[in-house]
Each structure stands twice: as C-alpha cells, then as structure tokens.
Regions:
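H-loop (His-switch) and adjacent beta-strand-loop-beta switch element
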Residues: 77-92
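Conserved catalytic motifs of ABC-family nucleotide-binding domains
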Residues: 25
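Catalytic Walker B motif of ABC-type/P-loop ATPase nucleotide-binding domains
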Residues: 29-32
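Conserved ABC ATPase signature
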Residues: 4-8
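H-loop/switch region of ABC-family ATPase nucleotide-binding domains
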Residues: 66-67
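ABC ATPase nucleotide-binding domains
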Residues: 105-124
Length: 124
C-alpha cells in the first residue's frame, strides 16, 4: 500500500473496491458491471480472479450484473435475464444463456456459443 488510490489504474481501483467489500465478510457480494471501463487485459484479469474467487468454498454468494455475456466468469451456475424491468428467464446458466433466449430478449436473431467455460454472442 505504497501508492495513493488516485494513482491506481482502473483495474487496480476495481480490485481495491472489491477487496474493501470483502473485508466485511459479507454473505452476498453484489458486483454491478465490475469490468465496465476496463481494457481487454484488465477485463480478462478481473474475470480470472472472479473465477478463482468463486471456486473457493468459503467465498460469499455472488451476483454479477452485466450487459455482456462474455463477461460471465467461469464457474457461474445460474443466470437471470431481465427485459422491460421484469424477469424474462432464469435458471441454470446453460439453460438460460441460449440463442433462443437471447434472440427473444434482444428482439434480434442471435447466435450464442459456449467455448470452454465462457459464453459469446453475436447478431446474425
């Protein structure tokens, strides 16, 4: 801790904010678009850390809010998709994050791919 907070990069600031939240030993960790504003390297580093953190049996339950399915960390078990302020679909992640559901929610033909432990989508 030999640097002032204001001199940290966005990725470093996000890690500090998450670390501060964890100091209170919460039962639930709510992450609202934690990768917003990060470059590709910062995003991937943070997602890797989330995946490692979530695999710890002592870690609190986590809710991650994102607009980009490629930002869903590996190890995520459930998903909920909102549309027009309500729940469009929820359940086990592989049943929720599908081409059919994403196309319906965005009212645009979408292709969802699952590669390794990550999801990717594109408009058709």
């Amino acid at each position: 801790a030999d640097r002032d907070y204001g001199t940290l990069s966005d990725g470093e600031k996000k890690r500090v904010q998450i670390s501060r939240a964890l100091m209170a030993d919460p039962e639930l960790l709510l992450l609202d678009e934690p990768t917003a504003g990060l470059d590709l390297g910062g995003r991937e580093d943070l997602l890797k850390r989330f995946s490692e953190f979530a695999s710890d049996p002592l870690a609190p339950a986590s809710i991650l809010v994102t607009h980009h399915i490629e930002e869903i960390p590996s190890g995520t078990t459930h998903a909920l998709i909102l549309k027009d302020g309500g729940v469009a679909v929820s359940g086990p992640i592989h049943e929720v994050i599908t081409s059919e559901h994403m196309s319906a929610v965005f009212e645009l033909p979408m292709e969802v791919r699952h590669e390794g432990s990550r999801f990717f989508a594109r408009a058709l």
